[in-house]
Amino acid sequence: MNAQTLPMPALKHVCDLAVTISAPVEVGVTPMGLRRMIPITGGVISGPLIQGRVVSGGADHQLIVADGTTAHLDARYVVETHDGVRLYVHNTALRFASKEDSLRIMQGQPVDPNAVYFRCQPHLE
């Protein structure tokens, strides 16, 4: 079998999202870990290819496992572009940080982004 090197994918900046949220709803500890739900109350989309707003009514569902350093995130919300098109967004993500930084994140305090491993896979409809 011949190995083939794939080319590096080309990435293009589409937009930035500034999402507003309200206080987390603590579900509590379950057999899977600590569950939280963070309501998404709105936001702004700005960028070279898409502008618009984040529609109120979405949420970021979080499962914080083990010793609190690992979080599985599942956010679902709707965005409306400047020309009235609505898109359904479903983000799945993995976040890992030290115990100290994880606690700061859960309390809504700022954390150095370089101290956090964060990978997100957005799905758009």
Q: Residue spans of the language-model regions?
A:
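Beta-strand-enriched cores of mature, soluble protein domains
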Residues: 1-125
